[in-house]
Amino acid sequence: AGSDKGYTDLMDTDSGEQFDRLEGVTNDVTWLDDDRFYYVRSYRETATPDGVKPPTSRVFLRDGGQDEMVYGSGVPTSHGLSMGESLHSEKALLVMSYGWHRSTAIAGELASPDSWEKIYGGNDFLAYPIDRVRGKYLVASFEGNGWGQVLSIDDAGSVETVLGEGKEVLQGVISTADNLVSIYMVDASSIVRRHDLEGHLIDEFDFEAPGSVSSLTTDGSDFFFKYQSFTTPHRVYRLGEDGLNLLTSEDAPGDFDINDLWSTSKDGTRVHSFLVKKKGVKPVKALLYGYGGFSIPLTPVYFPSAIPLLEDGGAFIYANLR
């Protein structure tokens, strides 16, 4: 269940003054107006107001310093809730999760918690809402082989496939009124694709060095994301009508090679790793790091503690066990 404890402070952006504090494990503040907002409270040690044993979570409305539980009554133990809103702040978008392999997409009118209901999922696969566009919900679903697909669902529950399941893992996707931008994982490295809302590919972007793309967001017209790799702390990109543009970047000094490395385990399974070394150097020593658990892959991240090893002629090997 975890033992995290904390608080959330809410600040006035003009004055910088704190005007409210949420005690406990709270997340996903979603504003209704200047004075009212929803938030998700996680219960780790005590029962919920409706008497369900922890761990679980509930959605509350905060109004004038007073809390009212507005969603989640009866959600069982070991089920968690997360919450957001559609791009134009009209719809509430929620996920009810059970473990690492099952979730349900929930949505409804932002101002009316009584309208929040399941729109997809609930079986033994992950599903989460992306947005509400052109009168339909877009949902990411990981049924089938679990690679990920994007579905369009109307208010009657009719389902159409926008992006079908391929051979790459869907890591994230967001939408504007005209386009979808998705992140896929290929050999533990990210590529970025842009499609129209009918699922036609507009363009695709990979990177000179294998890396990880995260923090995908939009202002309603352009898309923004962060890229990082073993020797690159960050690069921030904007993807708009004029293509992909680099906004800011930082790289570790020096020239390095990042290559894919494949090994065969005792039972015949092929295991992928990244081999990082200084360009032109034949390593005489190496540090191998690996992890496997909770279906979490090890994708390229900036690893400053490996830089001295690389500068000293060594190699850094990053093994993917999931």
Model-identified regions with their sequence ranges:
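Conserved beta-propeller blade repeats
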Residues: A1, E23-V40, G74-V95, S115-A140, ...
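A flexible loop/linker signature enriched in serine peptidases of the S9 family
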Residues: A1-Y7, L22-G24, V40-V59, V70-T77, ...
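Beta-propeller blade signature
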Residues: D9-D12, P55-G64, I106-L110, L151-D154, ...
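Short coil turn/linker residues within repeat-based beta-strand modules
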Residues: S15-E17, G64-Q66, S112-P113, G157, ...
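A short beta-strand motif characteristic of beta-propeller blades
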Residues: G16-L22, E68-S73, S115-Y120, S158-G164, ...
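Serine-hydrolase catalytic core recognition
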Residues: H88, P210-R322
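Helix-coil-helix junctions within alpha-helical repeat/solenoid scaffolds
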Residues: V133-G135, A140-G164
